[in-house]
Amino acid sequence: MVKIGFIHISSSSLRLVLAEIEEIGYFRVVDELKTPMKICYNLNNTCKVCNEKLHYIISTLKTYESLCLASGTSNIIAIATNSFNQICDNEIIVKSLKDNFDLDLRILTPKEEIYYNYLGIVKSLNVENSLVVEITGTSTNLTWVKDGNIEEWSVLPFGNINLTYNYGLNDRILSDSIDECNSFISNHLKDVDWLNNSFESIILIGDVGRNIAKIDKKRRRYPFDNFNNYELLDNEIHELYNMVKSKDLRQRRKIEGLEQDMADTIFTSLAIFHNISDLVSSRYIKISNHSLREGILYEFLDNNYDVIHDILDYSLYGILHSLNCNIDHANQVYKITLDLFNALKPLHHLDDNYLNILKTSSLLHDCGISINYLQHHKHSFYIILNSYINVLNHKELLMSAAIAASHRFNNYQIPVPQFSSIINKLDLKAIYELGALLKIAEGLDRSLVSSVKDVEVTLNDEEVIILLSSPLNLDVEIHQALRARDFFREVYDRDLIIRKK
């Protein structure tokens, strides 16, 4: 395992991300430090950073370097977004990084920013036809991603910082200023003719996306903190826009979920996105926590590691490796669960949309052992629920966690009331149906040596008969699997028969 540091200089902040990389190329963030700093706002009339601000930037970078050294980081990547080019004396910062830390600062072009945002997203989500929106301090980046490829892209010359201060929207918000700002945004959007196409969803990334998700989750009393792949509807964006525009700076600072350093720019952030969602024919909005930084990390991994290409498998096997789980057992339980799922389709009537849930729950069912074997099913529940697992939306993540937690032969109860805003009765039915199959599969590999080589299932009106092929004695496995018979009867209304062929 190695550690890598990532320093990111943007128009609104400096940020350090520390990540651990497993041998299989799986990374996980282990520390993150953000220093709010509206660099583009603090330029003086000659586009130079004032001495006080320059000293603060350099001292912050020294702190970042110290943190990297203390954590044993072996490699540091330093990048700056294109807004860095607005600083005419930026060579002072570049020279300081080189002289003090022996770091070469890479200043990205707009095209590179678009590409790395795209890479961060397609490595974490299945994107068929979406508009990707990033609102920075000085620009708005638009990317049309279709069938996993960049179809079109545009960079608009305004962001939340320059619009906020150009139109005096940092404190009290006057109606005339709102009208002028919205007119300016709308006119620029009309010049992007490819926005007239249809999109299945809009994916919002960056700090603006994270803050909108945090505000909306507080407003809805959302039951868990993970905001990657968080979903909203366009009318909810309009509600947030109308709520924020009625508040001055002091009142905005009290909005639950909003980071304090964005209180002055949150209105123009919403104004930009409000205009985009009005123009684009898509009701569905997703928030992605993966964007430019992750895109650069993925490129680094692809160049230096043999990375798993399936993005769901990348997450699942990465978690298995990092938690030192028994991967052979996980694979065997998944194989048997999948065989049972396919054989019992005439009974459960679940389609292939549940396959990602089945894979996640069966592969990660024992991940809680990394905390403690006792009650490990409960540990598995919250590990899965709080993990960033590619592809899965929040309902799928919750269902996967609940199914994994039900793999043992006990009376574990899913905390339904807490998550009633996410899952419904049909989801609960599917959880029980898949949970019953996982219980059987867990029992059929109780010896942890993949004894069962093949599973053959026959159905009738009263029974489900499972015939097992194996060169080994299966008495223990059959006994353990049959501990699920009462639950199976309750869920499938059939008696469970298991025997060796």
What do the predicted segments below correspond to?
Residues 1-5, 9-15, 19-80, 94-104:
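N-terminal glycine/serine-rich phosphate-binding loop of ATP-dependent small-molecule kinases
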Residues 4, 18, 42-67, 86-87, ...:
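Helical "lid/coupling" subdomains associated with nucleotide-phosphate turnover
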Residues 5, 14, 76-77, 131, ...:
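Conserved beta-strand core positions
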Residues 6, 132, 454-456:
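Short, surface-exposed charged micro-motifs
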Residues 8-13, 133-139, 205-208, 289-291:
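A short acidic Gly-Thr/Ser loop motif
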Residues 10-13, 70-73, 99, 136-138, ...:
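Short flexible coil/turn linkers enriched for glycine and charged/polar residues
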Residues 131, 136-139, 143-153:
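Hydrophobic alpha-helical segments and helix pairs
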Residues 492-501:
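A short amphipathic beta-strand at an alpha->beta junction
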